[in-house]
Amino acid sequence: MHAWPAPKIPSLPGRNRLPSLFDTASRRLVTVGSQQGASMYVCGITPYDATHLGHAATYVAFDLLVRTWHDAGVTVRYAQNVTDVDDPLLERARQVDQPWEAIAARETAKFRADMAALRVVPPDRYVGVVESLPQIIGLIEVLRSRGLTYELDGDQYFATHAIPDFGAVSHLGRDDMIALFAARGGDPDRAGKKDPLDALLWRGKRPEEPSWPAPFGRGRPGWHVECAAIALTHLPLPLDVQGGGADLVFPHHDMTAAQAEAATGRRFARAYVHTGLVAYQGEKMSKSLGNLVFVSDLCAAGADPMAVRLALLDHHYRTEWEWTPRLLDEATDRLAEWRAAVRRPRGAPGDGLLAAVRDRLADDLDAPGAIALIDEWTTQDGDDPDAPTLVAAMADALLGVHL
């Protein structure tokens, strides 16, 4: 599977330091990456409705991290998956009476176009679940060989209950885990399971569902093992960052880590980084609720993609916030002011601004702080003929906002 075209990133004088981000597992700021390189896996879309602003906020946030690493002189290895076969996709296919493969291809193409419009740097490994079935089946076989799976009515389950430190990412109590597992695609109440938190690895063949051959019977993979297998295939362990939205902390990231670590005996990730959820009309923006605002719809209605990106960046990646049309209006005005300022023949000196913007981004990706600094620069007078060009380059290279 291919990603989208990479935007051209301007070069800047000097370098930033390595960024520090909030690690959900340790509940503190940690330095991520090193001068020897950085690796990141970000959970991708299930392509049946893409790309809403909740998606966009997540991928723009991790794009900010990629750009900050690049600015620190770090070589980045970045993988992202596409869950191109899954229960919600199959349900959508039944609802609209279309092949699930066609829906997945169409929505993935739309996602690629949206990411390109938002100037998101693509992952160097953009990988679908279907194309990764050999690796997923191989990982399940490793877990089977270690006695960490069991069969139930043709399905294969991971013995989560056998992992002593399970829950090290979320730190949730057992009752909260079971409740969230039920709410987020799990089956804690299924009769015959050895433990409510045991996770489905392989769903045996069902009528009118796609299936593939495996040593343990035809079927299709469960959610968590997909990401574990793709990450293990394309990135070295431990990952520097496992990323995604806050709704993936549990069960997805706890279970992905448990399965990967059980198979390899190695730590899965040094840091787990999560973005806050975006609301609309008083509720979390989600496909199940249907309260979605799509990037493509905003752009089709005349919004500049750079204004959409600015609106997203004006909220710290870890905060929860609510989308309103006013935010796009404000971002459109800000974009116009920035563009006017960098087209002036002279401006206030930009060297100090560059250092300050870099400092904000290295400190837990403080994009709102960086934006405020550029706002302040646009109001200042100066006679530096190189400043407007430098500020335009830093906005593009560091924030991804092309002026």
From Swiss-Prot:
Q: Where is this motif: 'HIGH' region?
A: 45-55
Q: Which residues bind Zn(2+)?
A: C43, C227, H252
Is Metal-binding included in the keywords of this UniProt record?
yes
GO aspect biological process, one term = cysteinyl-tRNA aminoacylation
- Entry keywords, A to Z: ATP-binding, Ligase, Metal-binding, Nucleotide-binding, Zinc
Place the motif 'KMSKS' region on the sequence. 284-288
| Entry-linked InterPro entries | Cys-tRNA/MSH_ligase (IPR024909), Mycothiol_ligase_MshC (IPR017812), Rossmann-like_a/b/a_fold (IPR014729), tRNA-synt_1_cat_dom (IPR032678)
Positions of L-cysteinyl-5'-AMP binding: C43, G44, I45, T46, T58, N81, V82, T83, W223, G245, A246, D247, V278
Q: What does the record give as EC number?
A: 6.3.1.13
What this protein catalyses is: 1D-myo-inositol 2-amino-2-deoxy-alpha-D-glucopyranoside + L-cysteine + ATP = 1D-myo-inositol 2-(L-cysteinylamino)-2-deoxy-alpha-D-glucopyranoside + AMP + diphosphate + H(+)
> Which cysteine-cysteine pairs are annotated as disulfide bonds in the entry?
none
- What molecular functions are annotated in GO for this chain? ATP binding; cysteine-glucosaminylinositol ligase activity; cysteine-tRNA ligase activity; zinc ion binding
Required co-factor(s) are: Zn(2+)
Cofactor: binding details: Binds 1 zinc ion per subunit.
Which Pfam families does the record associate with it?
tRNA-synt_1e
Q: How does it assemble?
A: Monomer.
What does it do?
Answer: Catalyzes the ATP-dependent condensation of GlcN-Ins and L-cysteine to form L-Cys-GlcN-Ins.
Q: Which family does it belong to?
A: Belongs to the class-I aminoacyl-tRNA synthetase family. MshC subfamily.
Q: Which NCBIfam families match?
A: mycothiol_MshC
Q: What is this protein called?
A: L-cysteine:1D-myo-inositol 2-amino-2-deoxy-alpha-D-glucopyranoside ligase
Q: Which gene encodes it?
A: mshC
